[in-house]
């Protein structure tokens, strides 16, 4: 198994919102270390993975969620946090190496006493919660690498529609969302039953057309210092130039009335299902409909699973999940 240092260029740099700037492979390795006590559980899952490359340069982005916990005979004491990665790679002597690692903390919740003396945590009263490390208008993969050398399958392009929209919404870069939608896009958010941030006397509803859709997401974007829309690929049906995709939301810090006890710390919280209809326009897949269905399920997850997409997409796990939440496809 490769060590972290094997993956880094000798002159690699890292910029991490909680701890600062690091230069050189050895220092970067130190900067990425967990500074807190030895934990009984350390679970990390990645989602929203995008990577684009051109010649000898690649740009990759992803979201991660972390659940670290101590346990005694009766209770669990968890700390959850999540963030965004944008990493640059360079190919040298035929091998890809990380040349620049960027990480922005997006939320933290629970027993932050584990790290509060070592990390700059979120200031929820300010935009982004801290000085941003990542600028999506400059560093998101679609901007940094406008022409991808590696062709994508239809499935990859369809699932990436939501990854791109979420990057735009969470980072306040709504040009990405405009690129994703058809002109007549329809958002079916009536099931959300959340207070609309633009009109506080109303609940979320249905939104027709690109303008209404973008305005709806703009209203959501500023409700907190930073949002993190983690989604995992669950199921996809393609029929000629139309497709339906199912994505699962997971939010480690939004578990409603539940608590992380000794059982739930070993489970993946599922907070919503997104049903997405897409169609191909002039050879490009676009999102023409998204429906939002809130749920609250905890699904057993092996601690070694780092990508929930690979765990559920198209397999027996998805079959069990969809039956438990009443989806019939």
Give a label for each model feature.
Residues 1-10, 159-180, 184:
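Short acidic-aromatic low-complexity motifs
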Residues 21, 118, 175, 182, ...:
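Flexible domain-boundary/linker segments
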